[in-house]
C-alpha cells in the first residue's frame, strides 16, 4: 500500500522487489501475503501487470479501467482482432460460474472451460478476456499454486471497501507515489500512474499542502511530507530485479543512469533487466 502499486509482469522478480524493501528482507512474507490475498496481482493503472494492496484495488481499478480498456481495444482494432461486447459478457458469465465458491484456477484451466462453453480460447483471446475481467473488477489473482498464476473472483477474495470519489482517489494515488518515489516530477507521476497530464496536475494540487517542492535542472521536484528517504546516498550495493520501481517508476531516469547507458538496463520496447546499484547510481 505504501508504494501504491509495483509493476509485476515478471512474477518472480516483483516478489524480490517487494521482499527487499521489507524491514526484514525476504520472499516468504511476500508469498504468504500473495497467497492470502493481502497483495494482489492484476492489470491496473497501465495495460500491464501490477501488484496492489487488496484495500486499494477497487478504487485504483475505477480510476484506470477505462484507459486500459481503450488501450486494449485500440490495439485489437489495429490488428484486426476485435472481440465483441457479447463475447466479453459471455466470458464474464462463465468466469462467475467456474470460480464461484472461492476457487482459484489457472489460465489454462479457465481456457478449457471457455472452450466447452463455445468461446475462443487461444492465447490471444484468453489474454483479452482475462484482462477485461480484471479491469471490470470481476477477477484478480487467486491463491498461489507454485509458479503458476491463478485467478479468483475479486468480490470473494477482497472484503467490501468504502467507495472513493474521483478526487479522493486522485489524491490518494498522488500521496502513494510521492511518499514512495520522491523526489519526482509531474511528468514522472503522469508516466507511472497512466494519468493524462491534466489529471496528474490536479492530483498534485489536491495534496499540495503535504508536498515540498524544489526547482532543479529546470524542473519542479516534489517530496511528500511522509517520504522516508533522508536523501543521502549510502555506500551499500543493491541488486535490483528487472522492472524495479527504482527505474521503471520514472519517465526520466538520467539522474541514476546516463542516457547513453539506457540500452544496458532496458530496451526500447519496454523490457527491463536486473541492475546493480551503488550509491544510488546504476553501475552494472
Write out the residue ranges for each language-model feature:
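Non-catalytic regulatory appendages
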Residues: 206, 210-260
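Positively charged, polyanion-binding regions of nucleic-acid-associated proteins
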Residues: 86-103, 166-182, 204
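A short, conserved structural fragment
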Residues: 35-44, 48-49, 134-144, 208-215
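Short, cationic-aromatic polyanion-contact patches
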Residues: 51-57, 145-167, 221-230
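Short amphipathic alpha-helical interaction segments
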Residues: 24-32, 120-132, 197-204
Amino acid at each position: 500500500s505504501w508504494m501504491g502499486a509495483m509493476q509485476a509482469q515478471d512474477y518472480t522478480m516483483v516478489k524480490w522487489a517487494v521482499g527487499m524493501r521489507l524491514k526484514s528482507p525476504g520472499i516468504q512474507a511476500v508469498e504468504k501475503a500473495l497467497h492470502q490475498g493481502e497483495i494482489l496481482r492484476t492489470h491496473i493503472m497501465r495495460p500491464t501487470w501490477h501488484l496492489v494492496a487488496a484495500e486499494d484495488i477497487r478504487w485504483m481499478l475505477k480510476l484506470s479501467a477505462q484507459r486500459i480498456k481503450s488501450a486494449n481495444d485500440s490495439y485489437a482494432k489495429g490488428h484486426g482482432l476485435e472481440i465483441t461486447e457479447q463475447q466479453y459478457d459471455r466470458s464474464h458469465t462463465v468466469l462467475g460460474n467456474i470460480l464461484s465458491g472461492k476457487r482459484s484456477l489457472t489460465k489454462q484451466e479457465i481456457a478449457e472451460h471457455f472452450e466447452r462453453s463455445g468461446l475462443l480460447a487461444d492465447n490471444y483471446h484468453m489474454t483479452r478476456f482475462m484482462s477485461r475481467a480484471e479491469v471490470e473488477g470481476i477477477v484478480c489473482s487467486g491463491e498461489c499454486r507454485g509458479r503458476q498464476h491463478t485467478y479468483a473472483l475479486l468480490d470473494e477474495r477482497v472484503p467490501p471497501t468504502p467507495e472513493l470519489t474521483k478526487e479522493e482517489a486522485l489524491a490518494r494515488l498522488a500521496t502513494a507515489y510521492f511518499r514512495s518515489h520522491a523526489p519526482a516530477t509531474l511528468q514522472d507521476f503522469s508516466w507511472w500512474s497512466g494519468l493524462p497530464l491534466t489529471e496528474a496536475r490536479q492530483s498534485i494540487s489536491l495534496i499540495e499542502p503535504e508536498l515540498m517542492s524544489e526547482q532543479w535542472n529546470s524542473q519542479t521536484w516534489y517530496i511528500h511530507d511522509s517520504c522516508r528517504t533522508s536523501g543521502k546516498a549510502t555506500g551499500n550495493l543493491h541488486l535490483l530485479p528487472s522492472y524495479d520501481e527504482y527505474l521503471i517508476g520514472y519517465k526520466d531516469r538520467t539522474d541514476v543512469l546516463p542516457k547513453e547507458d539506457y540500452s544496458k538496463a532496458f530496451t526500447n520496447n519496454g523490457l527491463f533487466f536486473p541492475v546493480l546499484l551503488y550509491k544510488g547510481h546504476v553501475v552494472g
